[in-house]
Amino acid sequence: MENIAPALLEWFYKNQRILPFRTDPSPYHVWLSEIMLQQTRVSAALPYYERFLAALPDIPALAACEEEKLHKLWEGLGYYSRVRNLQKAARIVCEQYGGQLPADYDALRALPGIGDYTAGAIASISFGLAVPAVDGNVLRVFSRLYNDPGVITEPAVKRAFTARVMEHQPPEKAGDYNQALMELGALVCVPNGAPLCEQCPLASLCEARRAGTALELPHKAAPKARRIEPVTVVLAEDAEERFLLQQRPEKGLLAGLWQPLLWEGEALSAEEVCVRLEALGLACESIEPLPAAKHIFSHIEWRMSGYSVCVGSAEAPAGCVWASREQLQNEYTLPGAFKA
């Protein structure tokens, strides 16, 4: 196959989206954008990106940020382990590299939360290093370009595709080339529907287009079934119209975040909830059921039943706090599961 870079780059320079982390591709900006975009669409992430940078304009500011403020800045993006790793890495960068990301792929790859793709994106876009940055968009483009039925979630297949990506990469324009492939996958060679082949600068080279197999590619491994977990959520309100929050453990799902009272296991009856509240020193003055709901994590599905409970005046149990509506809005970070 002839080299795809000339046609790809010509298309990219004419059609790329104007994004703040492209306008100013400093290492910190590229890093932050890539972490945010791991599980979030560009249009949804941009307001968070701008708000985050306004509050934490550089790596030392990120490293020094208080945990609750950090979580609040991330609130709405989900997958909070991303921002915790972001801060862990920022602290290492301050300790070992003077607050500036290292211009070295392996050093970037060694930082918490930075994998092959993110390290490659920072190294190529911000530092001009000739390294790959292969994400799902790029794998899809190359799966169709070569009409390759390999399962792209398998490590050996990904390595083979990465080698092909590098065969076409112009070393002097590595960052632009990597971004162009991502952009092509995001805008033209799209998933979950018909690719826009008539708009593709690589259409004349695409083997899947010639074979009529573009809609069938790429192949992925079947997803693992999510584990179903019943939980009971209790919105406990006191006489001062404050709500009881408990902090989740420092490790595991939603680590360190705040939530209403929650019990895992089979759905509890109203009587069982009142008994448990009384064991915490809370008198159940009135109780009303809440609509059933569910929340899907990457590997777990919560089936949520719940109650709204008035408990009168009481001290917060150990590990809990009373929070006003204003504090819920401005101080405490609640996961999206509890915002229905």
For each feature predicted by the language model, list its residue ranges:
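Catalytic cores of DNA base-excision repair glycosylases
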Residues: 2-198, 202-211, 215, 283
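Intrinsically disordered, low-complexity, charged terminal extensions of DNA damage-control enzymes
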Residues: 1-18, 23, 186-340
